[in-house]
Amino acid sequence: QTILATIWPHANWEQKSCKRKKARSPFGKKFTKYLSKPCSMDDYKTFLLKLVDRYDGDGSNDMPGLTKPIIYWDIMNEPEFKMFFKGSEEDFVEIFNFSSKVIKEKQPDAVIVMAGAAAMFPENIKYWKSALPKIKDHFDIANIHHISGPDGQCDKELWVDEFAALLKSVDVNKPIWLTEAMTCGAPVKAWVKAFLNGAELIIDVGVNAPGKKMSKKGRK
């Protein structure tokens, strides 16, 4: 089994050290209460180096019992949404590029996955049209998410066609992964359309994702 590890650049104790303001997390107690840029990028670098060292599988300082290294690193998640990152676009770009450089220096064969774009609504497109040119040299795989909204509506290609067009508009030619795929009905038709529009890999989130809940029977 291959692991795609998501890196979060914030920890409660670290954010408290420079009196960052609390933020509202979508996951309650299961998530940090602070979502801002690290107080110290030097300390954050130390964390990243130790994290990669523990899971890179090089035989030195590895996690006890590690049988398969982590190669795929997803840096942050949906930064255009304040529920996951309380910072400016410039803060995100700084953290992302910094993280990518540190990881690649420590683990040259690492594959960096772009922080997943939450959707392709106008506000998402505006954010990523600005951010992508600033980070495009620091990731290997482009990443889009599709979670149905409270009304249960879905995009028939799971946003992949709009995302591919956005990437082309900013001269980004990278594989596309759909790492959070939630469908509104039988998933096969949606997956086929996503693949035909350029998705290389789809990770299905099943029936337990955020958004309008869907029964297992409804997916058949």
Model-identified regions with their sequence ranges:
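Structural recognition of alpha->loop->beta junctions
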Residues: 131-142, 193-203
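Aromatic/acidic polysaccharide-binding cleft in carbohydrate-active enzymes
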Residues: 178-220
